[in-house]
């Protein structure tokens, strides 16, 4: 029997990207069901490559769906779609309210268990418990299992076994030929996750000097653009992608990279959706918290063993030592070696 499944995850970009391997697996394993994703409208392009039984509803949380009135009108829109199951992958005030309304209407609802206690033990300053926590992918899949929809996570790429259509990006990137393409996404939301820019510049300088390699910089916003402009002036072979691509074409380009260097950031998760290796740098945060990119190998992480790490699940806490040694003490040579191990 065909069932209609609603999956809720509003933000942030990295977490929304992490729903894709789970939703893709669900769609393929339950082709008879209709799946609808409720998220912020801006993330819709992420879901375009999914199987035909996946639809999307964009929430306008700063406009018509703002506040209690807005949520009630959003609920009315959803109610009219006659869902049989509601899977809350977010479990924040907004999604809890929608789920309450669905529960009152007698619909089966399941919500994510965030595993806060285990994460807390991981980041506390004293008596840390260094245990690998369940990944977000597993937590999302657990929500579906509670609804009687167990899923085997066997996703490889939004492009299946291939890559994005190169003709779509070639006008921006030029031909690839036998060059090695390296993507670098040097930023993250918080200082505790950003490898110091002067050290990242040494990594860029190293690869920019090699004519067989092309470096693409990924980022967004004015301050990041200023940093990129300064780097490009020094290293003319390096290309900034700011303002040149949308989410869809950015994923396409990522699929043609040989390796991506990123922080613990959304770009790590986007690159992981197109089946390329990611070298990820970890400071205040740690892969043990469960936010490692899909199918990324621990051997491709760069991180230091410090007794204070990790100090934060999301990286927003300022460094209590004051020196961000967890990032500052990573040598550019370590990062270069990891990247070269993957492109050679």
Map each language-model feature to its residues.
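Catalytic machinery of carbohydrate-active enzymes
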Residues: 1-344
């Amino acid at each position: 029997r065909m069932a209609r499944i609603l999956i809720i995850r509003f933000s942030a970009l990295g977490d929304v990207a992490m729903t894709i391997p789970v939703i893709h697996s669900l769609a393929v394993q339950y082709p008879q069901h209709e799946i609808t994703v409720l998220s912020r409208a801006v993330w819709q392009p992420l879901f375009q490559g999914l199987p035909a039984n996946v639809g999307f509803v964009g929430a306008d949380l700063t406009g018509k769906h703002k506040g209690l009135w807005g949520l009630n009108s959003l609920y009315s829109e959803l109610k009219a779609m006659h869902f049989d199951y509601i899977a809350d992958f977010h479990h924040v005030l907004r999604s809890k309210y929608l789920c309450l309304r669905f529960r009152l209407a007698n619909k089966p609802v399941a919500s994510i268990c965030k595993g806060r206690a285990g994460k807390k033990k991981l980041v506390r300053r004293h008596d840390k418990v260094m245990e690998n926590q369940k990944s977000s992918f597993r937590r999302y899949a657990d929500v579906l299992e509670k609804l009687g929809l167990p899923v085997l996570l066997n996703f490889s790429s939004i492009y299946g076994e291939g890559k994005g259509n190169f003709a779509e990006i070639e006008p921006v990137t030029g031909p690839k030929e036998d060059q090695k393409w390296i993507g670098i996404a040097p930023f993250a939301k918080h200082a505790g996750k950003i490898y110091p820019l002067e050290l990242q510049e040494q990594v860029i300088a190293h690869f920019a000097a090699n004519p067989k390699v092309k470096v693409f910089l990924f980022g967004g916003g004015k301050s990041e653009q200023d940093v990129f402009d300064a780097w490009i002036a020094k290293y003319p072979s390096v290309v900034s992608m700011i303002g040149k691509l949308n989410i869809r074409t950015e994923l396409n380009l990522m699929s043609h990279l040989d390796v991506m260097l990123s922080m613990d950031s959304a770009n790590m998760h986007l690159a992981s959706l197109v089946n390329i290796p990611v070298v990820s740098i970890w400071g205040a945060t740690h892969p043990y918290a469960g936010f490692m990119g899909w199918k990324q190998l621990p051997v491709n992480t760069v991180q230091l063993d410090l007794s204070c790490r990790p100090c934060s699940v999301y990286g927003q806490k300022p460094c209590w030592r004051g020196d961000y040694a967890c990032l500052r003490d990573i040598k550019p040579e370590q990062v270069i070696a990891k990247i070269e191990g993957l492109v050679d």
